[in-house]
Swiss-Prot record:
Species the sequence originates in: Atropa belladonna
Cell compartments where the protein resides: Plastid, Chloroplast thylakoid membrane
Its biological purpose: Found at the monomer-monomer interface of the photosystem II (PS II) dimer, plays a role in assembly and dimerization of PSII. PSII is a light-driven water plastoquinone oxidoreductase, using light energy to abstract electrons from H(2)O, generating a proton gradient subsequently used for ATP formation.
UniProt keyword annotations, A-Z: Chloroplast, Membrane, Photosynthesis, Photosystem II, Plastid, Thylakoid, Transmembrane, Transmembrane helix
Protein known as: Photosystem II reaction center protein T
Lineage top rank: taxon: Eukaryota
Any one of the GO CC terms: photosystem II reaction center
GO BP field: photosynthesis
Transmembrane segments: 3-23
């Protein structure tokens, strides 16, 4: 049961870091809406 908790915390932390870096830097996608 503890393994599931640690796995969930690890995935959530990586997701938060990923979105933080993605929204901090300008998206390098070919979308010129703004």
């Amino acid at each position: 049961m503890e393994a599931l908790v640690y796995t969930f915390l690890l995935v959530s932390t990586l997701g938060i870091i990923f979105f933080a870096i993605f929204f901090r830097e300008p998206p390098k996608l070919p979308t010129k809406k703004n």
